[in-house]
Curated annotation (Swiss-Prot):
S-adenosyl-L-methionine binds at residues 112, 132-137. GO terms for cellular component: cytosol. Belongs to the RNA methyltransferase TrmD family. The gene is trmD. It comes from the Bacteria. This is tRNA (guanine-N(1)-)-methyltransferase. Specifically methylates guanosine-37 in various tRNAs. GO terms for molecular function: tRNA (guanine(37)-N1)-methyltransferase activity. Its main location: cytoplasm.
Length: 232
């Protein structure tokens, strides 16, 4: 997979690529990651990328020209590439959407800043606006990194143990159940006996039951979707 990120904050992505999942994917040759400083595509000597909004209002809006220049300069192909813009106006990001994106050949992220992006960019370039949650971030680049991390770990071969993906939260609309490791007893708290029984069927049923109980208690939206067989 190839991922391009057009941003005013390239170090957010670059520093993340030096650690964890992104580093593994790059090292294994399963990911190509290119980060593009938006200011490099501004035409004027001041490298201006934003301006006041028409009609008035607070803040500044990212301009069309540098964004179009950037996306076109990196070889954007409208019919093959998926252009993503993290945005409060977007569809809700979830595990199923992460899976869908992990199967794409190339993702191009346009990261907003300030009061947002000129709507003509959204209308003409963007295929998918994605919202990672109902809260405000200082930069769309942070949201893009969340999406990228979630997507890249689903690329076959990135994780050392692909089976671990099947046991994670949100698979089959369930939160992952409790996990324990050594020591067997810490202070007055012991590991549940069933996990020490060696009976794999009992352990599987126990984990499923606690996973269901946790989901019903903590995420009623997931629980209801599971019962209905719907996508969150």
């Amino acid at each position: 997979m190839r991922i391009d990120v057009v941003t005013l904050n390239p170090r957010i992505i670059e520093s993340a690529s030096e650690e964890g999942i992104l580093k593994q994917a790059l090292k294994k040759g399963l990911l190509e990651l290119f980060v593009h400083q938006l200011r490099d595509y501004a035409r004027d000597k001041h490298k201006t990328v934003d301006d006041r909004p028409y009609g008035g209002g607070p803040g500044m809006v990212l301009k069309c020209e540098p964004i179009f220049e950037a996306v076109e300069a990196i070889g954007w192909c409208k019919d093959k590439d998926t252009v993503v813009c993290p945005s409060p106006s977007g569809i809700k990001f979830d595990q199923q959407l992460a899976k869908d994106l992990s199967k794409r050949n190339r993702l191009i992220f346009i990261c907003g800043q300030y009061e947002g992006i000129d709507q003509r960019v959204i209308d003409q370039l963007v295929d998918l606006e994605i919202c990672i949650g109902d809260y405000i971030l200082s930069s769309g680049t942070i949201a893009a990194l969340v999406i990228i991390d979630s997507v890249v770990r689903l690329i076959p071969g990135v994780l050392g143990n692909q089976d671990s993906i099947l046991d994670e939260s949100f698979e089959d609309f369930l939160l992952e159940g409790p996990q324990y490791t050594r020591p067997r007893k810490f202070r007055d708290w012991e590991v549940p006996a069933v996990l020490l029984s060696g009976d794999h069927r009992r352990i599987l049923l126990w984990r499923k039951r606690l996973s269901e109980e946790k989901t019903e208690k903590m995420r009623k939206d997931l629980w209801e979707a599971r019962k209905k067989g719907e996508r969150i």
